[in-house]
């Protein structure tokens, strides 16, 4: 496969097609710069959930359940309330069943393409969204910021970086999540029921019927939870409804690894989802376990972190001062 990076149209929509190191990636700038597709072409592994017939139509209709969307703000805020050190914001409730505000808004915005290029054996793309009074959500959240995404594809997989810059005169809460949807099964040789997930979980964070944290906010791992640690947690055929964990590191190929490892026990192939230390938590969800996907989601803060009466170092809550930036990085690759 030759290295290339170019803008094309897919399903009638402009996207960025990246090819490098035996991988194929498709970035959808008009849908939050979602990584709409990631494929290990050499080993015929479809890593992320992707609809081949109408990929962009499906993605646009359900941007949290295809590909790799970037969420700001992550997960749920109780009653739509966001408490910041210098203000309290009231967001519209968009999860009527539980009366929460969920998943933020950035994953639905149309980004500007800043750069599309190759550099040796690397394909590189970057996109940007400027959030200000022109955004329809600004009436609820009048805090200007800039969102920058960079994607680098090479033989080591997909490297992702996400930067938020506070362009306002207010404090800006910094919480990031990727609602990453992995394909089940990963290849034609695989069976969905044979997928297993490994996480370096150290504490379980229980939630109530509204999927909000409840005391005690951190519990010791049960026998069920230990399946994640051992890498024996099934992802399909039974419901997983927001298993939330604080994570540490584990050993992968003799190196410290912070993130999730997915094993296809049919073939032995592994998908490694490595995230930086800012992601202190993972939450796992599989839409009742009856679909063709499952979502291990890295989060920089736990659910409803801004509103919890807990120290910031416990919840992962962070704020950016005016003019301040913060970047997180991730990498997805296969081990065959």
Give residue spans per PLM region.
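Short Pro-Gly-centered flexible turn/kink motifs
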Residues: 82-91, 162, 318-335
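Extended, loop-rich substrate-binding clefts of extracytoplasmic carbohydrate-active enzymes
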Residues: 1-10, 19, 87-88, 92-155
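Active-site/ligand-binding surface loops and adjacent short beta/alpha elements
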Residues: 90, 171-172, 181-276
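Acidic/His-leaning functional-site neighborhoods
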Residues: 23, 100-114, 231-308, 312-315
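Acidic-aromatic substrate-binding/catalytic surfaces of carbohydrate-active enzymes
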Residues: 24-88, 294
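Short, hydrophobic/aromatic-enriched beta-strand segments in well-ordered soluble domains
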Residues: 27, 127-129, 264, 323-334
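Generic N-terminal segment detector
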Residues: 1-47, 299, 312, 333-336
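Acidic, contiguous internal or C-terminal segments within carbohydrate-active enzymes
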Residues: 18, 29, 40, 130-180, ...
């Amino acid at each position: 496969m030759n290295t290339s990076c170019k803008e094309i149209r897919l399903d009638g929509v402009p996207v960025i097609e990246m090819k490098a190191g035996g991988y194929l990636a498709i970035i959808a700038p008009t849908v939050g710069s979602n990584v709409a597709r990631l494929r290990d072409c050499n080993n015929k592994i479809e890593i992320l959930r992707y609809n081949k017939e109408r990929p962009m139509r499906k993605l646009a209709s359900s941007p949290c359940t295809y590909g790799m969307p970037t969420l700001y703000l992550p997960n749920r805020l109780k009653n739509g309330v966001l408490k910041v050190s210098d203000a309290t914001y009231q967001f519209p409730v968009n999860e009527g069943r539980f009366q929460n505000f969920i998943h933020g808004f950035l994953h639905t915005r149309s980004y500007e393409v800043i750069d599309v290029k190759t550099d040796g054996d690397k394909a590189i793309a970057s996109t940007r969204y400027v959030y200000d009074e022109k955004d329809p959500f600004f009436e609820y959240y009048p805090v200007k910021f800039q969102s920058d995404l960079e994607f680098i594809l090479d033989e080591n997989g997909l490297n992702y970086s996400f930067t938020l810059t506070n362009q306002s005169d207010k404090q800006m809460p910094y919480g990031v999540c990727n609602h990453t949807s992995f394909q089940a099964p990963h290849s034609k040789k695989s069976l969905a029921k044979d997928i297993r997930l490994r996480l370096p979980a150290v504490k379980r964070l229980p939630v109530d019927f509204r999927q909000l944290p409840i005391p005690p906010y951190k519990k010791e791992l049960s026998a069920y939870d230990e399946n994640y640690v051992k890498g024996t947690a099934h992802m399909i055929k039974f419901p997983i409804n927001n298993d939330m964990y604080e994570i540490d590191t584990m050993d992968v190929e003799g190196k410290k690894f912070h993130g999730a490892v997915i094993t296809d026990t049919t073939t032995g192939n592994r998908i490694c989802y490595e995230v930086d230390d800012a992601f202190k938590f993972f939450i796992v969800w599989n839409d009742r376990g009856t679909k063709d996907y499952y979502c291990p989601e890295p989060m920089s803060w736990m659910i409803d972190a801004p509103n919890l009466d807990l120290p910031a170092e416990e919840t992962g809550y962070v704020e950016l001062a005016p003019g301040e930036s913060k970047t997180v990085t991730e990498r997805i690759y296969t081990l065959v």
